[in-house]
């Protein structure tokens, strides 16, 4: 080990070095770390802190390492990727040249910078995944603007909606997730480099903002202690992703329930189901079940991340190296979930006949419409109309005639059967709902068009952001 020569000496037993080493997790930031070292060395050369010849030699080795570090990834006794990079350079150039590589920086600011570089890129990957899923949802919504479906509250049929309206509800939740995750980029996009261990360096002319610009950052983390101690940008990203995952889990649970034989609203794509080893008739929703399980794990990871940072004293502690594997795992799981769910939704079929039967066979799904109608037309207090219709709903057999008779008896209102048929018709029920955001097909089409335009604009902006990263 390169760093065990000085205040700390001697070989460390492998079971100890393996325990404290982050090398197996550092592969994710390996190229970014080389990039950070290159920017730092270039700047040291620019301000004449090191000899130009030495600088060029180090940069040559770094370029070589950048192109092949993943293929040459170490499996020896190194504390982390940072020690390995310095060891590699010194081993190639000797200490008289390679020994300058860590001048003015520390592993502390180096790792914090590399994490932010990779996280920026991964956030963009996630945002692209959300956009793809949103495109799929809008396409499905366009197909099912007039496909009636039962809306549920308390897992019981409540009112009549459409599949398109349901898809747009999930779409809008994803939109908020997108904005939250995108917003975290502002806090991530700040360079810690030049903060060294925690108080900066003594090199005359070292310009942290200039080095930040080399690395694609828009600004620096100004306070040098905050720069190396802070991981709240990771927590922010993790919890924003956890909210996204939670929203996904709710929609996925709907699909699982809808695929049950008892409901049969959904026919899942062939490659998203599996059969039983003993029951030949089974079509198990396996990908949705794995998504559901992974969403639970993400919440566990998020809790671990919070607990890891809770009460951790300033400034740097090696506890922090246990945080980044959690971050990468959450991101990898989320990207996978977005891709799998997008594929499933693009191929899923809905049993429109079963959905229509589900809403048509239950006349009470339009009783809230009828209560409003009675109040508005006959000036009957809504609570009174609500109570009387609730009494009707308890009956075993409900017909238009029995409704008309009971309303006449209890409320002294004369609503003919033909009039009731119109009010309680599922399609007419939707068309009467003219408030913004309702499942009225006309309103839903307007919502879809508005979101198509917004999504294309969002996609264009993200593409420009990707080109800068």
Question: Residues of each region from the PLM?
Answer:
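A helix-coil-helix interface module used to build multimeric assemblies
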Residues: 1-191, 197-200, 205-208, 272-275, ...
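Generic, well-ordered alpha-helical scaffold segments in large soluble proteins
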Residues: 40, 44, 61-68, 88, ...
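Short, well-ordered beta-strand elements within core beta-sheets of diverse protein domains
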Residues: 40-50, 118, 165, 233-243, ...
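Residue-level "edge-of-site" marker
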Residues: 57-58, 225, 388
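Secondary-structure boundary/capping residues
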Residues: 98, 146-149, 220, 264, ...
